Design a protein with these regions (language model features):
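Conserved catalytic core of the tyrosine transesterase superfamily
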Residues: 1-212
Length: 212
C-alpha cells in the first residue's frame, strides 16, 4: 500500500472546507453603514464591529470583555481567549479605541451595574450575550446590504482578519498569537482564502510592520 496517501488524505480532508469571509470593501460598507446610527445601540454595535474588524476576535471574547480590560493610559486591550484559555495583550488601535470611547461615554447605560463593557440597552442592563452579539452583527450586515456567502455572523470578520494577515505575509505564529489560536495549524484553513493578489495594504501588529 502507498503509505503517503494513507497518511496525508485525512489531513487534507480536515481542511477541505473553506471558511466564509468578507472582502475589504464589504467590511468598509458595513462599518460605514453602522457608524451612521448614533443611538446608544448604534454606538454599541459599531464598537463591536470595530473590535471584530480590527482584531478578529471571537464573539465570546468581546462579550466577556470587562471595563478593566481596557487600559486607556497604556493604550492596550487585554483579551481572554475563550476557546484556548490564553491571554493576549493587544495595542488599542485608533479605530477600535475611538469607537469604544464613544460607546462608553455616550452609549453605555449609566445605570448598568455590571463590569462588562457591552450590555443590553434595556433594564436591568445585563451583559450582552454571544447570541445577542451574533444577532446585532447579523442585523448590521443586512442593513449594509452586504450578502456574504454562508453564515452571516461575527466569525466572518475573524476569517477576514486571518486572511488579510496571511496575505500580508505575517508569520503564522504571530497570526496565531493575535487570534488566540492554540497552534499554528489553526490558520491552515485560511490559506485557501489567501491566494489572491491584492493591492498594497499596511497592517500594524506588535513588533511588525508589513506591507504587501
Amino acid at each position: 500500500d502507498d503509505l503517503a496517501s494513507r497518511v496525508i488524505a485525512p489531513v487534507l480532508y480536515a481542511y477541505e472546507s473553506i471558511p466564509s469571509t468578507l472582502s475589504k470593501d464589504q467590511i468598509t460598507a458595513i462599518l460605514q453603514s453602522a457608524v451612521k446610527d448614533q443611538t446608544p445601540k448604534g454606538l454599541r454595535d459599531y464598537a463591536v464591529l470595530q473590535l471584530l474588524a480590527v482584531y478578529g476576535l471571537r464573539a465570546g471574547e468581546i462579550a466577556h470583555l470587562k471595563l478593566s480590560d481596557v487600559d486607556w493610559h497604556a493604550e492596550t486591550l487585554s483579551i481572554h481567549h475563550s476557546k484556548t484559555g490564553a491571554h493576549t495583550l493587544l495595542p488599542l488601535m485608533d479605530q477600535a479605541g475611538d469607537a469604544l470611547f464613544q460607546y462608553l461615554r455616550h452609549g453605555r447605560p449609566k445605570a448598568a451595574a455590571v463590569r462588562d463593557v457591552f450590555v443590553r440597552m434595556r433594564a436591568p442592563y445585563e451583559p450582552l450575550s454571544s447570541t445577542g452579539m451574533y444577532s446585532a452583527v447579523r442585523r448590521r450586515i443586512e442593513a449594509a446590504g452586504v450578502k456574504p456567502v454562508g453564515k452571516r455572523g461575527p466569525h466572518l470578520f475573524r476569517h477576514a482578519r486571518a486572511v488579510s494577515m496571511l496575505r500580508a505575509s505575517i508569520p503564522r505564529k504571530v497570526i496565531g498569537d493575535v487570534l488566540g489560536h492554540r497552534s499554528t495549524e489553526a490558520t491552515i484553513p485560511y490559506l485557501k482564502l489567501a491566494t489572491e493578489d491584492l493591492r498594497s495594504v499596511a497592517l500594524d501588529v506588535p513588533g511588525h510592520e508589513v506591507r504587501l
